[in-house]
């Protein structure tokens, strides 16, 4: 039994489509605090700011471990934590904070190419064994009109998604192509999940 440490409807739907019916328990992790701690640790060590892949992996780890700490091994075999961020135009962004932020994101994304990173962190409940990895895919954005962007934002869909877009919903019409695993762009990579589960045995 998989316990999904995420409230993402896209991740849940992806697993269900693949024949997996997970339980869901949302973590109480303070994402900003996790990223701040990661940045401070690297700065103290004289290292560069964390990459997008390092950021999503840190968040996926924090979410999975938070849920694992309060999970009885009889309730789940594996806890799965995920987090996604879009890297575009030299910036790394998660969910937009409001409609104005989403609109500004689309001004940057329109006609451009970005990389969607999704971190995966698995914890085996019985003994705490872990497996982790990052799925990254290149996303080529179309050039929707301002009217289309306004209507899309008014739908509310992009406000709950990393990068302010989806490929499995209304936003799919504005995506010209993807190089990489489309499931990873939705929020959970099925091929990577399979490999990580195999690593755990």
Task: Give the residues covered by each predicted segment.
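GST superfamily/GST-like fold recognition
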Residues: 1-19, 112, 127-129, 136-201
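Short beta-strand and adjoining strand-loop segment in the mid-core
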Residues: 91-97, 134-142
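Active-site-adjacent loop/tail segments of enzyme domains
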Residues: 78, 84-114
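N-terminal polybasic phosphate/anion-binding patch
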Residues: 1-78, 199
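Acidic/polar active-site rim loop that often engages polyanionic ligands
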Residues: 38-44, 87-88, 127-135, 178
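Residue-level signal for inorganic ion chemistry
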Residues: 15, 60, 83, 102, ...
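Anionic-ligand binding region
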Residues: 99, 103-111, 119-132, 136-137
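Short, well-ordered amphipathic alpha-helical segments that serve as non-catalytic structural scaffolds
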Residues: 59-67, 105, 149, 189, ...
């Amino acid at each position: 039994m998989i316990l999904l440490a995420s409230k993402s409807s896209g991740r849940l739907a992806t697993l269900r489509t693949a024949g997996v019916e997970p339980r869901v328990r949302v973590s109480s992790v303070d994402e900003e605090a996790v990223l701040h701690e990661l940045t401070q640790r690297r700065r103290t060590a004289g290292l560069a700011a964390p990459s997008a892949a390092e950021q999503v992996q840190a968040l996926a780890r924090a979410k999975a471990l938070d849920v694992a700490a309060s999970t009885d091994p009889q309730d789940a075999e594996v806890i799965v934590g995920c987090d996604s961020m879009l890297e575009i135009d030299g910036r790394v962004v998660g969910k937009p904070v409001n409609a104005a932020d989403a609109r500004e994101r689309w001004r940057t994304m329109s006609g451009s190419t970005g990389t969607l990173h999704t971190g995966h962190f698995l914890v085996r409940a019985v003994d705490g064994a872990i497996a982790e990895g990052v799925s990254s895919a290149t996303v080529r954005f179309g050039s929707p009109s301002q009217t289309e962007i306004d209507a899309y934002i008014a739908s509310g869909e992009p406000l709950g998604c990393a990068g302010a877009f989806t490929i499995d919903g209304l936003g799919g019409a504005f995506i010209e192509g993807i190089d990489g695993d489309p499931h990873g762009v939705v929020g959970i990579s099925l091929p990577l999940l399979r490999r990580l589960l195999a690593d755990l045995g």
